[in-house]
């Protein structure tokens, strides 16, 4: 239960508070995760990011830059946001939650269901932290230390990309979320959430340049999901393979229409 609430007005002050209280303190963005089961925090000190001026969207030489405190719904409403990212933002089913949650909080929460991560992985998003460090989102997920996330950068925001979520109902548990993207130089990206302990890319499958049934089978063989109330291992492998192959076909069609 949070007993102390600090509201610094600069990144430097926020970092100093974190250095002072270390593991006793938690970064507080929108609060949708820290105040709700199953991600409710047990930390007693909260460091609010509300006054750090991180709620913005900008362009820099063709790259899309998003402040970590940008709320999901206003971000989804922005007309210039890439279609796949807009689609993924809608996977957070409740408009109320989208108005509270921040994109940085969704990344940092590292929850079991992370419906935004596949599209960010497929778009090769980079993360900027309060100490000036920049990491690819894939590297961050491999070692998600307790850093202060300040910015998300997508250098190629309009690459051909498609994403989809499979769930039992709109508000129900997600079986799998997938995103597929095609790049100009080094082939496809395949990113998944829901079939492993964290979101991941299928690098080995990407290198094979497959499509159709061959792609379905390769994806199914590359993942090792656990059986639970969302489905059996066989079902999860099957539906994930079909989903990725369909998304790849969508990307191919979109690329042809753009020519």
Swiss-Prot record:
Record-annotated FAD-binding PCMH-type domain positions: 1-159
Pfam families the UniProt entry points to: FAD_binding_5
SUPFAM superfamilies (alphabetical): CO dehydrogenase flavoprotein C-terminal domain-like, FAD-binding/transporter-associated domain-like
Taxonomic superkingdom: Bacteria
Cystine residue pairs: none
Matches recorded under PANTHER family: XANTHINE DEHYDROGENASE FAD-BINDING SUBUNIT XDHB-RELATED, XANTHINE DEHYDROGENASE SUBUNIT C-RELATED
Name of the protein: Uncharacterized protein YgfM
Gene that encodes the chain: ygfM
């Amino acid at each position: 239960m949070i007993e102390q609430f600090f509201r610094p007005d600069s990144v430097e002050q926020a970092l100093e508070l974190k250095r002072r209280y270390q593991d006793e303190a938690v970064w507080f963005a929108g609060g949708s995760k820290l105040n709700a089961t199953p991600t409710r925090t047990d930390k007693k000190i909260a460091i609010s990011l509300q006054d750090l001026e991180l709620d913005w969207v900008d362009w820099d030489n063709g790259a899309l830059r998003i402040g970590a405190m940008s709320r999901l719904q206003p971000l989804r409403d922005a007309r210039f946001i890439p279609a796949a990212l807009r689609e993924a933002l809608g996977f957070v089913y409740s408009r109320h939650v989208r108005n509270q949650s921040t994109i940085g909080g969704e990344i940092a929460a590292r929850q079991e269901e992370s419906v935004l991560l596949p599209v960010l992985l497929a778009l090769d998003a980079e993360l900027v932290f309060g100490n000036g460090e920049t990491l690819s989102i894939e590297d961050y997920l491999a070692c998600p230390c307790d850093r202060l996330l300040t910015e998300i950068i997508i250098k190629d925001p309009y690459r051909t990309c498609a994403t989809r979520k499979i769930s039992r109902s709109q508000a129900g548990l997600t079986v799998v979320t997938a995103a597929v993207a095609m790049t100009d130089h080094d082939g496809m990206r395949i990113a998944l959430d829901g079939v492993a302990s964290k979101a991941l890319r299928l690098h080995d499958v990407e290198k094979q340049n497959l499509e159709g049934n061959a792609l379905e089978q390769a994806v199914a063989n590359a993942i090792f999901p656990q059986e639970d109330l969302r489905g059996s291992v066989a079902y999860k492998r099957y539906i994930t393979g079909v989903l990725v192959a369909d998304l790849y076909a969508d990307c191919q069609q979109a690329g042809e229409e753009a020519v």
